[in-house]
Amino acid sequence: YVGYNSSKPADDTLLVGRITNSIGEILGTVVNYACHPTTLAWENLKISPDFLGTFKELMKENTGAPSLFIQGASGDLAPAAQYSGNVALAEKHGRQLAFSTLAVLEGMSTPGKSLFFKETVASGAPLAIWKSKPVPAASNMSAEMITIEMEIQ
């Protein structure tokens, strides 16, 4: 379906991936969200990253690492307030996406760890007790960058 479709719910899924080094420092984030960066339109006569500029700035400022935005399937998905020349509106949309992403990052488990259910404790109502444990080494991945000199032919 192309264009606005009032008979179907919009996909508002925000997928966030975190890339860390071996001591848990964030090296980068990957963010997938279905929304065209179309806040700014014909009233804006400058080249602009739209809301993604503010998003990337805030992510770098708060994590110390770059972020990669991957636009999800968004044939009909765009900001409700859009087609404007108002740069402040695009910046607002960028802050909304960045702060939502940062909230997801804050809620993620510590790199290399996972939560598991330990027990229930009775305290007027059954309370779940969760503990942290290391992730098995087989599920950890690592990478190394190497440089190869090649002659141009």
Task: Spell out what each predicted region is.
Residues 1-153:
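Non-catalytic substrate/cofactor recognition surfaces at enzyme active-site rims
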